[in-house]
UniProtKB/Swiss-Prot annotation:
Pathway info: Amino-acid biosynthesis; L-proline biosynthesis; L-glutamate 5-semialdehyde from L-glutamate: step 2/2
Entry-linked CDD domains: ALDH_F18-19_ProA-GPR
Organism: Idiomarina loihiensis (strain ATCC BAA-735 / DSM 15497 / L2-TR)
Name of the molecule in the record: Gamma-glutamyl phosphate reductase
SUPFAM superfamilies in UniProt: ALDH-like
Disulfide cysteine pairs (residue numbers): none
InterPro entries documented for this protein: Ald_DH/histidinol_DH, Ald_DH_C, Ald_DH_N, Aldehyde_DH_dom, G-glutamylP_reductase_CS, Glu-5-SA_DH, GPR_dom
E.C. no: 1.2.1.41
Keywords: Amino-acid biosynthesis, Cytoplasm, NADP, Oxidoreductase, Proline biosynthesis
Amino acid sequence: MSQQLAKEISQRAAKAARAVATLSETDKNAVLQKMADAIRARQDKIIEVNKKDLATGKEKGLSDAMMDRLELTPERVEGMASAIEEIIALKDPVGDSYVLDERPNGMKIEKMRIPLGVICMIYEARPNVTADAGALCFKSGNAVILRCGREAIESSKAIAEALHEALEASNLPKDVITVVPTPDRELMTELLQQKDYIDLVIPRGGEGLIHFVSDTSKIPVIQHYKGVCHLYVDKDADLDKALAILLNGKTQRTGVCNALEGLLVHQDVADKFLPMAAKALAEKDVTIHADKRSVSYFDGADEIADDAFGEEYLALEIAVRTVDNYEGAIEHIQEFGSGHTEVIITENDETAKRFIREVDSAVTMANVSSRFSDGGQLGLGAEIGISTSKLHAYGPMGLEALTTEKFVVTGNGQVRD
């Protein structure tokens, strides 16, 4: 049953992809505006359905971070609609071309951006991904299969109804955006075998989900891996600036992948900065896990071993370590970072440039909060995820990351000798 359903869903999506691949930017934008309008019109219904998911999640004991991701408020529903309108304002990359070469025989060689085809998005308690991914894939000329976790299934279906309303009003097949009707693991496994119809899989979620999808899929996978993001306070840091960025990165919103999970402090400024951090983090009720060189600065902190870092807390918790020097910070990040986002605070331009050049992560920042590691904040509009895979996309994935390039060769009757 699951095998047949997975094949049917994938086949319908592949057929629908052909319908959207050739739409003009003007036509796609008109449909997207209808999607935004439909989400606004259905706000009350979406929130009502979401309350059922929240009640179920509470009964099942979901973590505070998961519940935060799951919850839809009027502001968040409006945010989904606004994100679609931001996508409308973005230039459509499909059809863009550039000349590579003109051969001696007169052939013209170009490369042109084209849609990927069918994208399968697998995610957990993030109903907003339904709207974001649906709109991004549509604008980039792709069909999308959305498989959300059981935590958000009803909310995602309600959002999909709004998107389908816009598609049907535009005489387009609903299969352009498909929400898998059940979170059944067997069905997901079968979807990951549909290499004849699905072109790319993007998982967003916990470590277990990412590993399962990567190990099971016969289709190329771009991972949205966990966010173990670090803040390194250099010996030449502005400490007031560092404190503000620490608090923003750790406490503004904890259950997101661009929140800070690790604090590294150069030993030359530890005596001054760590007491500042201890006071400010205590006021925000942040639990501290610190190495033996740092633990005494914090009341009630627990000491952790040197090999116990690298945890994605997604809560008011942070790991703290004092490092000997810049090289010590880099070594720590290389060992315990997840390749998501890393931040340095320093007034030394050469050190900042070196950090940006040497740190191996999808996003590297100097003197700004990790919370800006987000497609919308970086000018991409809504993002489909933050890739930690070094494939054609690395970092926040906007429209262009959902396309590929093909060669276009034009001539005037040339034949090969």
